[in-house]
Amino acid sequence: MAEFFPEIPKVQFEGKESTNPLAFKFYDPEEIIDGKPLKDHLKFSVAFWHTFVNEGRDPFGDPTADRPWNRYTDPMDKAFARVDALFEFCEKLNIEYFCFHDRDIAPEGKTLRETNKILDKVVERIKERMKDSNVKLLWGTANLFSHPRYMHGAATTCSADVFAYAAAQVKKALEITKELGGEGYVFWGGREGYETLLNTDLGFELENLARFLRMAVDYAKRIGFTGQFLIEPKPKEPTKHQYDFDVATAYAFLKSHGLDEYFKFNIEANHATLAGHTFQHELRMARILGKLGSIDANQGDLLLGWDTDQFPTNVYDTTLAMYEVIKAGGFTKGGLNFDAKVRRASYKVEDLFIGHIAGMDTFALGFKVAYKLVKDGVLDKFIEEKYRSFREGIGRDIVEGKVDFEKLEEYIIDKETIELPSGKQEYLESLINSYIVKTILELR
């Protein structure tokens, strides 16, 4: 089989002193940490849409990407070429997982029946390639946002026919995700929301969204799909106000409709910042709710108001992200999927590799720093001391439900002073910096 990236060698770990852009500096996939290889802690995944479908187009300019599969003019030939390129790409980067939307991997036909037949052919190609590879499917999903039929939404559309089409599309996407051994299935509601309340029945749309998700849960049970269902929150873009705004909003929705036991969250860094949160905030919320499922790894540009999907290169952010993952017990049916694209001017094939290497190194280093933070317990000790007043005396009585407003008033009414601990934010932020530097210095 012809190579798509003949000029790119298999990427190796060369250590922190390496200046080779096509080598890992911090990510050694076989390095054992806490009893298992680093690759199993991180579970890196390639996003099919950004890596093999994105062409560098933007609202102001034509495609710029120079991609070897673009020499194919027949849509099916191009689809098969992209699949073959995926496996070569993953194997050269030592990435064991990939994710896709149904419409990423196969073109649409004139009817859903025809589209499904086309999709089946591409799935067969993927299955054939899987036989000779260790590359696996992390999660699948359906594209319910690109086609004009979804202009009013999919599960929240005003058209019963569109609702039916979306349901049938998810049905098929669930089937192929199961067929390919996917560990999870993602629901992202890019068109599930509104532009204005003047033409929106908000209550009805939310009820229909719940009906849709309940149907998906029921169908997954009927076909024996045991993968993890994941909601991917995002506050806006492409829709002005999206119903899965953030973890707290989406969890409240799931809880109020009795769906919370079936779903966890796929947290994307750039979506968190669009919602006015830090990446760590969304991960922490998901963790304390017991709903941290998977991560879409990227970063945004805080000076811009849209989802830039850049490769993650901020070690401070990845440290705090992996801190939450480790505290949650690590990934089970989830991982780190690079929902990231090279910049429009980074148009060469090697840039695809360099971008992934940068992200993998950044998360590997972040994991190593976070592991030391968790192991040393420095943040836990500080937080424990900060809330010490609730482990003794009146604080303990509050926690144990032994007091009410009257008793608390009686306790406090004659106290002249209250002593408070310092938050020491500056110290803790500098402590993270120290751990990052210390970790780098200790690496070979």
From Swiss-Prot:
Recorded GO CC terms: cytoplasm
Range of residues in the leader sequence: none
Pfam family, one: AP_endonuc_2
Location in the cell: Cytoplasm
pH-related activity note: Optimum pH is 7.1.
Assigned keywords, A-Z: Carbohydrate metabolism, Cobalt, Cytoplasm, Isomerase, Metal-binding, Xylose metabolism
Family from the record: Belongs to the xylose isomerase family.
HAMAP family the UniProt entry points to: Xylose_isom_A
Name of the protein this chain belongs to: Xylose isomerase
Originating species: Thermotoga neapolitana
Gene, per the UniProt record: xylA
